[in-house]
Amino acid sequence: MQDYSHLEQAIGHAFQNRALLRQALTHPSVGQRNNQRLEFLGDAVLELCVSEKIYEKHPEMHEGAMTQLRQKLVREEKLAQAAQSIHLGDALLMDKSCEATGGRKNPSVLCDAFESVLAAVYLDGGFDAAREMVLRLIGDCSETGDADGKSALQEFLQAQGRPSPCYETVAETGPAHE
């Protein structure tokens, strides 16, 4: 079996069940025993880890803002960056055609692999191990959401106990409206 010690060190977990890690690293292009089911579980584990940390770190934040922050932290781009930081793409098992078309660097593939490995960590080491991986690679969720103007105004008004604003379109300009 391939040596994954560098990857284990990067994610902060030494696997007892190496076959689980191998499955998490197996792209669907290789065969039936791939990482898709683990990806499903990893998505849920990731959302729980991030939600718990946001809840703990931001006691003043209301539900809508917490949801926005979670969406920002678990988006594909962020997970792909985390996967790249530990060279997860290099460890993936995939067929030659997928590799030839840039599969090891594809953000969607990296995001899926990140979630799969997270699920494998969860199954192998429990929730605490999964949480540690998330905190190590995504951060402690201390950043705040960069809300768009409308959302920021609405959140401010809600915090003040005031009614939500009413919006009226005055004009539509730009390339999308020509």
Indicate where each model-derived feature is located.
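Double-stranded RNA-binding/processing signature
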Residues: 1-178
